[in-house]
C-alpha cells in the first residue's frame, strides 16, 4: 500500500527553486562538460529535432541563458537534472565547461520529480515522452515501496505526483501497449494520435498484428495515415 502522500513534481520543483540557496548553499560554478553524466531516469526525447537545433543556435550565439542543474554522482562527476539538451548542444559545439547549479536530493523519487518538473516546464513534450517518463515514475514508486497494488490506485498516485488527471495518466500509459511498429508509425506522424490511442487500448491490443498485415499488403497511395486508419476499421469490423 502507498505510504504518506508525496508532493507533486511541480510543488517539489517550486520548493527546490525557492529554497535552493538556503538548503544547498547554492551558487553557480563552471563544471567541465566531460564530468557531466546524462541522468538514467531521463526518458524524454534527445532527438536532434527543430527544437534541439534552435537550442544549439541559442547556445552558440548567446551562451547559456539558464544554468544547468546537476547533482553529485561520485567523485568529480555530476548527474544532470535539468539541461540534458543544452549539455548535448555544448558537446556538439565543443564547449569544455558550462555554468551549473549543484543540488542534492534526499532520495531517488525526489530527484526524479525535480527532473520531470524541469522538463515539463521547459519543453514541448510528445505523448510518448510522457508515457515513458511516467513508466519510470511508476518503477521508482515501486522501488520505494509507495506503489499500491491496484491499477486505478497506481494511476491516482501517479496523477498526484505529476499534476495530471488520472484519466490522462492512464491514457499516456496505454501508449506503452503499442508494439514497436505502431510506436514508430505514431512518432513519425505515419499514424494519427487518435488511432494510436485507439490501438493502445487493452481491448484492441490483439488487433495490432492484423492492422500491420493489412498495411503491408495494401497501397497507401500517398496517404499512409489514411491507410492505417482503414486497416484499423477493417480489423475491428
Where are the language model's segments positioned?
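Short, charged/polar connector segments at secondary-structure boundaries
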Residues: 2-103, 115
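Alpha-helix C-terminal capping/helix-coil junction sites
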Residues: 59-60, 142, 186
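Short, surface-exposed helix-loop/turn micro-motifs enriched in polar/charged residues
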Residues: 28, 69-70, 77-78, 108, ...
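Amphipathic, charge-rich alpha-helical segments that serve as recognition/docking helices
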Residues: 44-46, 52-53, 88-177, 194, ...
Amino acid at each position: 500500500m502507498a505510504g504518506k502522500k508525496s508532493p507533486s513534481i511541480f510543488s517539489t520543483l517550486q520548493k527546490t527553486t525557492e529554497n535552493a540557496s538556503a538548503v544547498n548553499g547554492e551558487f553557480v560554478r563552471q563544471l567541465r562538460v566531460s564530468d557531466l553524466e546524462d541522468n538514467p531516469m531521463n526518458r524524454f526525447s534527445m532527438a536532434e529535432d527543430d527544437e534541439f537545433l534552435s537550442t544549439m543556435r541559442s547556445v552558440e550565439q548567446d551562451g547559456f541563458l539558464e544554468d544547468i542543474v546537476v547533482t553529485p554522482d561520485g567523485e568529480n562527476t555530476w548527474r544532470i537534472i535539468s539541461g540534458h539538451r543544452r549539455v548535448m548542444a555544448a558537446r556538439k559545439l565543443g564547449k569544455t565547461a558550462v555554468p551549473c547549479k549543484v543540488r542534492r536530493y534526499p532520495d531517488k523519487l525526489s530527484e526524479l520529480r525535480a527532473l520531470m518538473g524541469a522538463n515539463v516546464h521547459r519543453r514541448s513534450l510528445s505523448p510518448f515522452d510522457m508515457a515513458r517518463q511516467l513508466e519510470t515514475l511508476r518503477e521508482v514508486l515501486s522501488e520505494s515501496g509507495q506503489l499500491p497494488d491496484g491499477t486505478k490506485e497506481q494511476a491516482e498516485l501517479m496523477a498526484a505526483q505529476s499534476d495530471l488527471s488520472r484519466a490522462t495518466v492512464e491514457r499516456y500509459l496505454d501508449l506503452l501497449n503499442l508494439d514497436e511498429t505502431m510506436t514508430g508509425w505514431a512518432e513519425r506522424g505515419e499514424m494519427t494520435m487518435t488511432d494510436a490511442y485507439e490501438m493502445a487500448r487493452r481491448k484492441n491490443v490483439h488487433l495490432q498484428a492484423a492492422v500491420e498485415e493489412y498495411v503491408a499488403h495494401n497501397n497507401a497511395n500517398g496517404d499512409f495515415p489514411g491507410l492505417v486508419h482503414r486497416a484499423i476499421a477493417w480489423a475491428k469490423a
